[in-house]
Amino acid sequence: MQVIKEELKPFINSKPKNRELPLESVKIHDNFLTDQYVKHLQSIFFNQSFPWCYSPFVGYNFQDTKISKEERDNHLYLIHKIYDNLRPIEDSFQTFDQFLPILEALEVRSLVRIRALLYVNQTVLIKHETHQDAPYPIKAALLYLNDSNGYTGFEDGTKVDSVCNRLALFDGSIPHHSTTCTDAKERLVININCF
């Protein structure tokens, strides 16, 4: 799948090695994109007019869990679906195009979804519900677009800190969780699931 035009290739600093599932551990790639491309993506997602949707829960719907109402009220985030259900989301065609260089660098054969996730500072670091991106092996890529003290945690104790321009690759069927942050206004993560 050759989708990157020659003028777009300079946006990727380091290309992960193609790996077949299952990924046995989390692989970290720092400085994945060029600084120029990171700033470009930040200008899209941190723009005041960028449309975000409110989600009252992170991970799973809390109706089936034993989390208290107080905890439920703090487990929220903003989401923007870019690609889902085998197609770009209608109002996100231009946003989707911005990810073509990333998808080629990840050697995506079949894209499942791309979502932008915005976790708002709530003055305390909140660990969200552990979840799976899918109940079957699937490649998961998390691209962190700002620095914060938030992180992605895994059941084995592995923590991936939110460092701007860091890419974390793992099997999305491995249980993991997100957090809020306390040292920045927000925590911005791009979540890509693919084969």
Regions found by a protein language model. Name each.
Residues L125-E129, Y136, Y144-V163:
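A short beta-strand-loop-beta hairpin characteristic of the jelly-roll/cupin
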Residues V160-H176:
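Conserved metal-binding segment of the jelly-roll/cupin
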Residues E129-T130, P175-D183:
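Short beta-strand His + acidic residue motifs that chelate non-heme Fe in jelly-roll/DSBH
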Residues Q2-R109:
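Non-heme Fe(II)/2-oxoglutarate
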Residues E104-T123:
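A short glycine-rich, His/Asp/Glu-containing loop-to-beta-strand
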Residues A141-L143, A184-F195:
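A short hydrophobic beta-strand segment most commonly corresponding to one strand
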Residues L118-V120, L145, C194:
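Short beta-strand segments enriched in hydrophobic/aromatic residues
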